[in-house]
C-alpha cells in the first residue's frame, strides 16, 4: 500500500491539483513548492502569500495535495510504526552521545544543542557535517550537508582536521558541505525556505543552523517586539521541520542561553526562544563545560527517550567518548 502511494505521488504534478493553473504553478515553483508533498505540508497563508490567491482557495489546493500524498488522515499505531522504519540515524562521533539519543540524530526531527559560549555546540555541528558525508558503515549517510551559518563560525580548517581523523579525504568532504552565511533573521528565514532548491541538485541529508536564535535575539529587543520575534521563529522552525520531513533529513540546530533572574537555586540558564523552540524541537541537548576538553551532554526533552546525561570529549580529532 505504501509503495503505491509513493508511486501515486511521483506520477502527480502540481498542475494536477484543482485550482492550480499555469500562472499559479509557476509562482508555486518559483517559491519552492514544486511537488505534491511540499504543498501538502504547507499552510494556506504561505500559499496565499506566494501566489496571490485567497486563503480559502489555497486551503482547497492543500487538501487535494494531502489526498494525493495520502497524509493528514488518522493512522493506526501499526501504520505509524511501519512509516517510522524509513527514519535513519546519524552518528555524533561519540557512542555515549549516540546511546543517549537512542542511536544518533534522527531524520525528520529537529535536534537542538544549547549551552553557554564554549560549550561545544559549533564543534558538534562541524563533526555532524563530516559524519554525514561518511559511508553508512561508519555511521554516516554518504550524503551532502547544508549549513546556515549565522555567526560566521564555520571553519573549513576544522573540517579538514575532523575528516583526516575519520580517514576521509578532506577535499572531497569540503566539496559536500554547502554553507550559506545568514546576515540577519529575514535572510536566515529565506535561506531555509530556499533550501529545497539545493536539495534538488544534491543529496542533502543534514541541514544545520548555527545558531538558530542569534539574529532573532539581537534584532528583536524588548517585550514590545517579542510577539513578532516568536511568530517569525515559529515559522522558521516549521520550515526546517518541513524540509526534514520531505527529504528524510536530519535537522541540527544550536541555541544560546540566558540567565533567568528569578532562579535562586539550581542552574539559572535557559535556552533562548521560549516555548516556540521548546515545543518544536524534537530532541533538546544541554551542553556544559567540564575539565580537560570534556563536555557534559544532558538530554532534557524527547518524545520517547528518558532524561539522562553523558560525558563526551572534544579534541583536535573531533567529538568522541575520550578516554
Curated annotation (Swiss-Prot):
DNA damage recorded as keyword: yes
A GO BP annotation: DNA recombination
Single Gene Ontology MF annotation: ATP hydrolysis activity
Keywords, in A-Z order: ATP-binding, DNA damage, DNA recombination, DNA-binding, Nucleotide-binding
Keyword Nucleotide-binding attached: yes
PROSITE patterns on file: RECA_2, RECA_3
InterPro entries cross-referenced by the UniProt entry: AAA+_ATPase (IPR003593), DNA_recomb/repair_Rad51_C (IPR013632), DNA_recomb/repair_RadA (IPR011938), DNA_recomb/repair_RecA-like (IPR016467), DNA_repair_Rad51/TF_NusA_a-hlx (IPR010995), Hlx-hairpin-Hlx_DNA-bd_motif (IPR003583), P-loop_NTPase (IPR027417), RecA_ATP-bd (IPR020588)
Segments of this protein annotated with the region Disordered: 1-21
SMART domains the UniProt entry points to: AAA (SM00382), HhH1 (SM00278)
Compositionally biased residues, Basic and acidic residues: 1-15
Residues binding ATP: 115-122
Pfam families: HHH_5 (PF14520), Rad51 (PF08423)
SUPFAM superfamilies: P-loop containing nucleoside triphosphate hydrolases, Rad51 N-terminal domain-like
Family stated for the protein in its record: Belongs to the eukaryotic RecA-like protein family.
The protein's role, per its UniProt record: Involved in DNA repair and in homologous recombination. Binds and assemble on single-stranded DNA to form a nucleoprotein filament. Hydrolyzes ATP in a ssDNA-dependent manner and promotes DNA strand exchange between homologous DNA molecules.
Protein name as annotated: DNA repair and recombination protein RadA
Amino acid at each position: 500500500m505504501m509503495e503505491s502511494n509513493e508511486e501515486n505521488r511521483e506520477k502527480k504534478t502540481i498542475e494536477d491539483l484543482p485550482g492550480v493553473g499555469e500562472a499559479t504553478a509557476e509562482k508555486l515553483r518559483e517559491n519552492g513548492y514544486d511537488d505534491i508533498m511540499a504543498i501538502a505540508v504547507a499552510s494556506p497563508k504561505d500559499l496565499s502569500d506566494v501566489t496571490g490567491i485567497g486563503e480559502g482557495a489555497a486551503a482547497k489546493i492543500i487538501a487535494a495535495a494531502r489526498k494525493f500524498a495520502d497524509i493528514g488522515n488518522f493512522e493506526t499505531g501499526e501504520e505509524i510504526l511501519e512509516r517510522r522504519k524509513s527514519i535513519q540515524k546519524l552518528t555524533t562521533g561519540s557512542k555515549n552521545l549516540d546511546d543517549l539519543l537512542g542511536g544518533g540524530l534522527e531524520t525528520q526531527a529537529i535536534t537542538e544543542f544549547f549551552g553557554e559560549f564554549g560549550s561545544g555546540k559549533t564543534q558538534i555541528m562541524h563533526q555532524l557535517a563530516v559524519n554525514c558525508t561518511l559511508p553508512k558503515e561508519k555511521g554516516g549517510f554518504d550524503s551532502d550537508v547544508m549549513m546556515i551559518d549565522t555567526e560566521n563560525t564555520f571553519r573549513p580548517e576544522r573540517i579538514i582536521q575532523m575528516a583526516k581523523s575519520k580517514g576521509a579525504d578532506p577535499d572531497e568532504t569540503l566539496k559536500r558541505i554547502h554553507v550559506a552565511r545568514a546576515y540577519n533573521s529575514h535572510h536566515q528565514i529565506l535561506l531555509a525556505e530556499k533550501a529545497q532548491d539545493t536539495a534538488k541538485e544534491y543529496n542533502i541529508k543534514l541541514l544545520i543552523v548555527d545558531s538558530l536564535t542569534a539574529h532573532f535575539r539581537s534584532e528583536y529587543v524588548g517585550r514590545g517586539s517579542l510577539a513578532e520575534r516568536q511568530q517569525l521563529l515559529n515559522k522558521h522552525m516549521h520550515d526546517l521541520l518541513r524540509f526534514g520531513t520531505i527529504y528524510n533529513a536530519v535537522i541540527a540546530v544550536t541555541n544560546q542561553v540566558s540567565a533567568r533572574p528569578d532562579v535562586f537555586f539550581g542552574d539559572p540558564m535557559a535556552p533562548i526562544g521560549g516555548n516556540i523552540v521548546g515545543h518544536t524541537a524534537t530532541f533538546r541537548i544541554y551542553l556544559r563545560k567540564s575539565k580537560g576538553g570534556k563536555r557534559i551532554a544532558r538530554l532534557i526533552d524527547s518524545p520517547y527517550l528518558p532524561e539522562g546525561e553523558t560525558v563526551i570529549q572534544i579534541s583536535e580529532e573531533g567529538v568522541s567518548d575520550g578516554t
